[in-house]
Each structure stands twice: as C-alpha cells, then as structure tokens.
Amino acid sequence: MSMKYLMLLFATMIIRSFADSGNAIETTSPEITNTTTDIPAIRLCGPEGDGYCLHGDCIHARDINGMYCRCSHGYTGIRCQHVVLVDYQRSEKPNTTTSYIPSPGIVLVLVGIIMCCLLSVYRFTRRTNKLPLQDMVVP
C-alpha cells in the first residue's frame, strides 16, 4: 500500500474529532489585528463534495490535495460504489475441504494395490506348496 493511502486511512479514523474544531487564535498589536484559524489536517468536504461519495462521507486531506471517501459499512471502492457481498468475503477464505478430497482416493488406490500384491504372493506360495515332489530321491 502506498504511504498516501495509509495516511488517509489513519486520518479518517480521527476525522470526527477534528471535523468541527477550528481553534481561532487572535493576536492584536496597536496597528494590526491578525486572526489565525487552525485548519484541521482532515475535514469534511462540505458543499463541493456533495454527491461525490455514493455511500459514505467525503473528506478532504490538507496534505493530499483532493477528495477521498470514507465508505459506510458494506461498501467499498474509490467512491464507495461497490457493495461488499457476503459470498465475496467467504471466497477470500481458502477452501480446505477440497484439499482433503483427493487424500481418501489416493489411500484407497494404494490399499487396493497392496491387497493385489499380497493376494498374488499368497497364491504363488500356495501353488508352490501343492506341487508334488517328483524330483526328490528317497534314500
């Protein structure tokens, strides 16, 4: 993520506390009166931002020129134009059940191969034990 996005994200968390606070500092000398208003780093856009964000609040950051949206719950996008679907949130999680499906199949195939091997060895040894001993000479 870019640094500007991180700054904006942090700033939107504290926008409510600074949105309405504008501290005015007034200094007076015999000839000049100077009033300085403390402008918050992040503020609501005001009338120029009406309708900019479709489902959220429009904010203006002092350091980053431009309007940005803080989306309401359930919306996303640059202008909060996309609805976050429940199925989309579920699809982000890895599906672990499909990774276990091949395992029983592989185990069954291996057990079948082992059973065939054991059966063939059993038949071979049984056949060799039943053969008559014709070549054997009795003393």
Curated annotation (Swiss-Prot):
Claim: Glycoprotein is one of the keywords in the record: yes
Q: Where in the cell is it found?
A: Secreted
Q: Which residues are glycosylated?
A: 34, 95
> What is the first-listed, main subcellular location in coarse terms?
secreted
Cysteines joined through disulfide linkages: 45-58, 53-69, 71-80
Q: What induces it?
A: Expressed in the early phase of the viral replicative cycle.
Q: Which GO terms describe its molecular function?
A: epidermal growth factor receptor binding; growth factor activity
Name assigned to this protein = Growth factor
User: Which organism's genome codes for this protein?
Assistant: Camelpox virus (strain CMS)
Source organism phylogeny? Viruses, Varidnaviria, Bamfordvirae, Nucleocytoviricota, Pokkesviricetes
Per UniProt, what is the name of the gene that codes for the protein in this document? Answer: OPG019
